[in-house]
Amino acid sequence: NSSSAATSGNSSSAATSGNSSSAATSGNSSSAATSGDYSTATATGGDCSAQVEGKNSLAIANGAHSKARGVLGCYLVLTEYTDGGKLLCAKIAKVDGTAIKENVWYTLKNGEFEEA
């Protein structure tokens, strides 16, 4: 019941469904999305986005001005870069419904999760 998809190139997208599925993209403005439990969505590149809709899943967005979102119980991994492309920090947070809300886009700003 698992599936995988991978794409590269600016404005690329990958989407999968099924438990333990994975979607990966690279390129500016790329997006990755999964809708199965225990799944992973990974996007890299400036202005990229990752979203997960299954329980116990992981959304990883690595790039300047990247964003991620997920449902309750999922984890979001985000990075923050300088305008010159230097990595400032990487952080992970659990979507708990309070500090990190369900189905809300987040980005890192000054090292903290902030609604995008």
Q: What spans do the regions from the language model cover?
A:
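Periodic small-residue-enriched repeat registers in elongated scaffold domains
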Residues: 1-116
